[in-house]
């Protein structure tokens, strides 16, 4: 005699089993992050057990944010890790997975954090184009505009160079990661600079609005309005490229990576930059000290009193002696 239990067991068909699986099957949707175990490696991908009825598949191009030539560079049999569900089930009921998407999301999260901390990062230039240079930060492709590359060598020679960089723009939605080499250099250089400091620089470029002065590997702007007290039609009438001049720092803007310079404040008399540049260079330190004293007086809210020169003191003494002689 066959028991009822045995009859029930015999009557449990494959269709019943499939229906039971459907009843308790988890629903997977694109965008979900799930745990999965590698159970089969293929030449261009791998099969992953994530608890679905059919093994999910991850193609080699979705295994990393970086280039992968062999799946075993990233995955090993029986390894368990997180996967991103990339697509719905295909006609065979198979899901497509991705590790690259997870790395991509976390990379953007990391660069946003680095930008918020105003961190300086380093990266090798892997290519250049007409607009600038290309680097990778946390696996993401970043762009350095030509105007933010501060280097004395040709742009195309930067390939392979390890550069310090600051973040200019981090926009995941638009897939824009823009960085500045110049700002990183200026920030580092600024640690040894201060307003009212006199430095020697070389004219590296001349524009209608001013001259760019190289001061130890970084550029500062000598605006046309800060060249002289006298009117100047164009900086070209005052400077030539590669001229060596003394300039005074009048502003340091670390956030924008800008150094503002002046020769106007170093003029012992108006127009000296146009008439006698050697005199400006000779008296640069003295005029810079006067500039510092003026700024200090302004900060304290008191009027500035220029120091009495030695010649003026001698004249006063001569006048005093002359008066004494007359009295006698």
UniProtKB/Swiss-Prot annotation:
Residues 311-328 have a biased composition (Acidic residues). PROSITE patterns: S1 (PS50126). GO terms for molecular function: mRNA binding; structural constituent of ribosome. Gene3D superfamilies: Nucleic acid-binding proteins (2.40.50.140). Pfam families: S1 (PF00575). Residues 298-328 are annotated as: Disordered. It comes from the Bacteria. GO terms for biological process: translation. The keyword Ribosomal protein applies. Residues 31-100, 118-182, 196-264 form the S1 motif domain. Keywords: Repeat, Ribonucleoprotein, Ribosomal protein, RNA-binding. GO terms for cellular component: ribonucleoprotein complex; ribosome. InterPro entries: NA-bd_OB-fold, Ribos_protein_bS1-like, Ribosomal_protein_S1-like, S1_domain. Belongs to the bacterial ribosomal protein bS1 family. Binds mRNA. NCBIfam families: PRK07400.1. This is Small ribosomal subunit protein bS1A.
